[in-house]
Amino acid sequence: MEKLTILVLVAAVLLSTQVMVQGDADQPADRDAVPRDDNAGGTDGKFMNVQRRSGCPWEPWCG
């Protein structure tokens, strides 16, 4: 009985590892897609964009 339990646990671990390694199916559209730069302005550009959208809390001193 103990050997059967160990065998079932090992099988479950192997199956879950196989699913993690394979992941979801690779779609043809994903393979052909051109990667885009989500952070084209860098960290500073991202910060300035947020600052412009939300407004400056120190209005007289904002540049």
Curated annotation (Swiss-Prot):
Q: Which GO terms describe its molecular function?
A: ion channel inhibitor activity; toxin activity
* A single cellular component GO annotation: extracellular region
According to the UniProt entry, which residues carry D-tryptophan? 58
One matching Pfam family is: Conotoxin
Query: Is this entry keyworded Secreted?
Result: yes
- Between which residues do disulfide bridges form? 56-62
Signal peptide interval = 1-23
Q: What is its main location?
A: secreted
- Keyword DNA damage part of the UniProt annotation: no
Keyword annotations for this protein, in alphabetical order, are: Amidation, D-amino acid, Disulfide bond, Hydroxylation, Ion channel impairing toxin, Neurotoxin, Secreted, Signal, Toxin
Q: Where in the cell is it found?
A: Secreted
**Proregion residues excised on maturation:** 24-54
Expression sites (tissue/organ): Expressed by the venom duct.
Query: Which residues in this protein are found as Cysteine amide?
Result: 62
Additional observations: Exists in two forms, due to cis-trans isomerization at 56-Cys-hydroxyPro-57. The cis conformation is the major form.
What is the purpose of this protein?
A: Its target is unknown, but this toxin may modulate voltage-activated calcium channels (Cav) or calcium-dependent potassium channels (KCa).
Q: Write the protein's name.
A: Contryphan-S
> Can you name the source organism?
Conus striatus
